[in-house]
Amino acid sequence: VARSLLIFEVQQPFLFLL
C-alpha cells in the first residue's frame, strides 16, 4: 500500500501539500 500512496503523492503533489 505504501507504494500506492507514494505514486498518488507523485501524481497529485498539490493534494499532499494541501
Curated annotation (Swiss-Prot):
GO terms for molecular function: serine-type endopeptidase inhibitor activity. Glycosylated. The keyword Glycoprotein applies. It is found in: Secreted. Serine protease inhibitor, which acrs as a regulator of the classical complement pathway. Forms a proteolytically inactive stoichiometric complex with the C1r or C1s proteases. May also regulate blood coagulation, fibrinolysis and the generation of kinins. Very efficient inhibitor of FXIIa. Inhibits chymotrypsin and kallikrein. Belongs to the serpin family. This is Plasma protease C1 inhibitor. It comes from Oryctolagus cuniculus.
